[in-house]
Amino acid sequence: MAVDDLVEEITKKLGEETCLSDWLNVDQSMIQGFADVTKDHQWIHVDVDRATKESPFGSTVAHGFLTLSLIPHLGGMVDAMEPAYPGLKLAVNYGLNRVRFPNPVTSGSNVRTRTKLVGVDKINDECFQVVGEVTIEIEGKEKPACVAEMV
C-alpha cells in the first residue's frame, strides 16, 4: 500500500482509541530484572522489607522507565504478524513527548495501555509519522501510572 493511501486511511482514525491492551502483572521479579539490567537498585524498587516499612507506597514500586518501556509490548507494536496499521512494513520508535508518571506502579499491580491516535503526518514518499497519546492505567486506580505521546 502506498504511503499516501496509508496516511489517508490512518487520518480517518484521528481522535479514536486505537488500542486497549490486556492487563499485565508487574511483579517483583520483573522489577528486579529491570533493576539488574539498568543498574538502578534504589531500595524503593528492590528492598521489599524496607519499602514495606519506610516507603509512602507500602511496597516496592516499578521504575518509571520500566513502566514506560512496557508501551511497545502492551500496545501490540512488536507483533510482526499483526502490524499496528495494516499495510505497514516497518515501524520505528522515533521518540516520546510530554512523558509524566502521575502514579507509581506498586509490585503486584496490573497495568494496561490505552492509546488514542492524535497525529499523522507524511514525511516523504516512503514514510510517515504517527503520534499516539498513550495512557498506562493501573487496575483499580483512578490516576494513571504514565501518560506520554509516542511518536
Regions found by a protein language model. Name each.
Residues 2-93:
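Hot-dog-fold acyl-thioester-processing enzymes
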